Each structure stands twice: as structure tokens, then as C-alpha cells.
């Protein structure tokens, strides 16, 4: 029996990253392998006693080793009690200067803390090969296992057939960190809102709107083309909890996934594509890593290579409802390999290998 300790800082509340990378995969893992693994959750291990820690075989943490900004002290304690630890990363450990959280991360020494945790970890788990190579090349961590994000449809991402308004409903959802990505669609949306042939045939929904956030207001301005959209063309789905946000997809036919091609974005995960696929939505997506390996243009998506493609492909889908059906059906098939039961199994096998080395 493997005794696993999972550190979820937001526990008992669950943040988005903790939900996808820690809570859900280990929840499913405990069901699949209940006779082989015992999982305990805790929100920090800095204050844990040696006696408590000695009862476990492996501890898993996301990004940071310490909640009290003293990672070296925690690393030394884990070494002292002989408890190996795994750091899970689903995006870059360095924030670009134009990132909305850059200065907060700089003030908190996040890059240094994550680097220290990764360098000293028994192993790391990451979402894809590019991020794994980054950690090996820059931080010297060679013991890395690729464990992608997954979706567990039961409960939060179940298929539903919503009642639409006779229009094609496009939608974008995401956090305020994606403002620069959303801007890629502005010109195309502006043209669409004002095109006589199309302006009454579609609607755009902004998922994750945060009323009190100035950046969220800026995203709303972009998606509505600075108010050019009228009430029949634009709507919002307000920010909600991790167990409810999947309901956004029930309001749309087509998921819009813009992403600028830069280091930080390339090291992110393909989660939005997976969410859209499991909710059986057609997708228009930037042809940018980490999405590009899963994209098949005209088969399971429409790939955007230039900002003008947003208008081109949105009108294409308005004109071709059968293509919407074909794309969403194929993407649903293609993402099934990312079902959480498969991903949780991959993660479990990684843990066994780590402990057997």
C-alpha cells in the first residue's frame, strides 16, 4: 500500500490549478486503485511534525514546496525524515514582464522558490514535453514524467444539449491573465458585429467575467468590440467556482481559443481544448503549442494562423452548420484519451516508478 500525501494550499476550498492537477486526478486515482494506494490531503506541510511525515511514502506539491516562503527549511525537513517529494508544474516557472501577476510574483520571489523546489525534488510531473525539456535544461531536473491534464466528465463536464436561440453561439472563457490573447480576436469580432450579412446570426459569450476586476472589464471591452455589440449579440457568464464553471459551455456551440505564440504560453497546457472537446463544442483555435499537436484543421477544429482568420472562420461556421457538427463530433472522439481515468492511471504508474528507483 502506497501512502501518498497531497498538498493543496487552497484546501478545503479548491482553486482551479489545484482542482485539475491535484484534487481531481488523485480523487479518481484513489477510486481506481483503492487497494494499492491511500491518499491524504493537507493544505501545508511546513508545520507538520517529523512523526506525521514519516507515515507517508511520497508527498506531492504543485509549484511551491513551502507555504511560508521558507522552501529550504521544508526541503531539509523532508530529507531528514527520508520522505521523497514530487513537484507538479503545469506552466512556466518564470513569468514574462507583461504578465499581470509579474510584480506580485517578483515581490514574493516565486521564480526562486519554484526553482529551488524543482531542483531538489525527487521527481517532477509536467503537462508536456516542451515544459519538461525547459525544466531539465534550465533547472537541471532530469527525473520528469509527462502527465497531461485530464477531464472527468461525470459531475462537472457532462454532455448536455442546451436550448439555443436560433443563432450560432461563440464563447471565450478564461482568467484575467489572458487579456493579451483575447486582443488577437478584436478586429475579427468588430467586423463580425457590424457585418450586415452576419450581425443577426450569432452571439458571443464571455465566460468568467469578474465584476470587480478592471482587467476583466477590459476583456469584456475587447470581446464586445468596445461596446459595438448590442445586447442580442453579446452576453456574459460570471466568474464561478471550479465545480460550476463547466456550465459555461452549455451556452455555446463554438469555443474560441486565442493564444499568442510566446515562451510562457507555449509552456501552458491544452486544458481549454480538452474542456471544449469533452463538452462537444466546435473549436476555432490558435495554431500554437501546446494546442497544435492535437489540432487537425477542418477535421476536429479550425486552426488560426493570422488574426484575420478569426473573422474568416467564424463566418465559415455561421454559413456551414454541418461543419460545426462535424468538428465537434470529431474533437469529442479525439480528446477521450485525456479522460481522467487514463490520466490518473498514468500518474499512478509514474508514482510507482519514482518509488521503485
At which residue positions do the language-model features occur?
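Membrane-proximal helix-turn-helix segments that form the acceptor-binding/catalytic region
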Residues: 80, 104-124
Amino acid at each position: 500500500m502506497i501512502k501518498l500525501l497531497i498538498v493543496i494550499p487552497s484546501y478545503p476550498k479548491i482553486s482551479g490549478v489545484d482542482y485539475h492537477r491535484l484534487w481531481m486526478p488523485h480523487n479518481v486515482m484513489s477510486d481506481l486503485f483503492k487497494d494499492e494506494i491511500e491518499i491524504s490531503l493537507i493544505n501545508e506541510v511546513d508545520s507538520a511534525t517529523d512523526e506525521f511525515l514519516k507515515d507517508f511514502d511520497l508527498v506531492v506539491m504543485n509549484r511551491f514546496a513551502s507555504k511560508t516562503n521558507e522552501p529550504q527549511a521544508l526541503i531539509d525537513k523532508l530529507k531528514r525524515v527520508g520522505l521523497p517529494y514530487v513537484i507538479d508544474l503545469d506552466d512556466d516557472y518564470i513569468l514574462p514582464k507583461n504578465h499581470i501577476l509579474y510584480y506580485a510574483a517578483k515581490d514574493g520571489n516565486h521564480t526562486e522558490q519554484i526553482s529551488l523546489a524543482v531542483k531538489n525534488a525527487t521527481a517532477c510531473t509536467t503537462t508536456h514535453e516542451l515544459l519538461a525539456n525547459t525544466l531539465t535544461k534550465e533547472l537541471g531536473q532530469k527525473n520528469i514524467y509527462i502527465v497531461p491534464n485530464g477531464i472527468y466528465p461525470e459531475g462537472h463536464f457532462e454532455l448536455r444539449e442546451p436550448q439555443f436561440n436560433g443563432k450560432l453561439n461563440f464563447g471565450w472563457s478564461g482568467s484575467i491573465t489572458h487579456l493579451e490573447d483575447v486582443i488577437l480576436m478584436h478586429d475579427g469580432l468588430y467586423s463580425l458585429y457590424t457585418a450586415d450579412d452576419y450581425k443577426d446570426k450569432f452571439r458571443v459569450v464571455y465566460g468568467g467575467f469578474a465584476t470587480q476586476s478592471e482587467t476583466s472589464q477590459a476583456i469584456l471591452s475587447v470581446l464586445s468590440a468596445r461596446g459595438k455589440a448590442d445586447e442580442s449579440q453579446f452576453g456574459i457568464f460570471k466568474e464561478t467556482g471550479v465545480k460550476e464553471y463547466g456550465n459555461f459551455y452549455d451556452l455555446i456551440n463554438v469555443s474560441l481559443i486565442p493564444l499568442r505564440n510566446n515562451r510562457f504560453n507555449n509552456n501552458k497546457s491544452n486544458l481549454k481544448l480538452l474542456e471544449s472537446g469533452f463538452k462537444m463544442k466546435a473549436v476555432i483555435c490558435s495554431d500554437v503549442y501546446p494546442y497544435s499537436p492535437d489540432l487537425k484543421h477542418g477535421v476536429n477544429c479550425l486552426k488560426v494562423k493570422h488574426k484575420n482568420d478569426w473573422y474568416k472562420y467564424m463566418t465559415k461556421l455561421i454559413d456551414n452548420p454541418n461543419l460545426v457538427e462535424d468538428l465537434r463530433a470529431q474533437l469529442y472522439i479525439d480528446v477521450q484519451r485525456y479522460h481522467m481515468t487514463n490520466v490518473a492511471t498514468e500518474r499512478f504508474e509514474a508514482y510507482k516508478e519514482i518509488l521503485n528507483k
